């Protein structure tokens, strides 16, 4: 029991308590902010997820129509399936490019009136959703979040706990 009365023991215990408090406080703060930005991404009237889901749905319709007219859509289908699980900015950029290219290919086909009308409607909705992504309030929240989380000590806690930067659509 003499070990409890030594100064070095007290310093070690105090250091461990301070370290635990800093880690716990950092975890709580960064977790709260991370959850808030994730919530902003997935829910609400103008969440990015809503627009991305619309884009994916309209893209899937275009892929199905292209298949009907014998156009190879293996790459497009692969991207579509990959985006069912997660989004990255590169994927969204690739989705826009592939939709634009596939739309041009399908438009060159001899489409019946009904298919042409549906394709035009879906393309318009896709383009509208893609444009809306750049004008929603979420982007400002994401920029603020990324700025705050890139500063010390938040950056340390984000890397320690595996919190990634928020997607910003510009």
Locations of regions flagged by a protein language model:
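A helix-centric hydrophobic-segment signal that preferentially recognizes long
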Residues: 2-170
């Amino acid at each position: 029991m003499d070990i409890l009365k030594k100064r070095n023991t007290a310093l070690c215990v105090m250091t461990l308590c301070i370290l635990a408090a800093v880690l716990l406080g950092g975890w709580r703060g960064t977790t709260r902010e991370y959850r808030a930005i994730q919530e902003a991404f997935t829910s609400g009237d103008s969440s990015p997820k809503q627009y991305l889901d619309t884009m994916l749905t309209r893209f899937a319709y275009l892929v199905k129509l292209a298949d009907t007219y014998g156009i190879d859509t293996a790459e497009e289908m692969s991207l579509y399936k990959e985006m069912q699980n997660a989004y990255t900015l590169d994927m969204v950029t690739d989705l826009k490019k592939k939709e634009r290219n596939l739309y041009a290919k399908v438009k060159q086909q001899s489409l019946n009136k009904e298919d042409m009308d549906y394709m035009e409607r879906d393309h318009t909705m896709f383009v509208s959703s893609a444009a809306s992504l750049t004008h929603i309030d979420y982007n400002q929240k994401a920029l603020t979040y990324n700025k705050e989380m890139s500063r010390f000590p938040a950056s340390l806690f984000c890397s320690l706990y595996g919190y990634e930067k928020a997607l910003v659509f510009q």
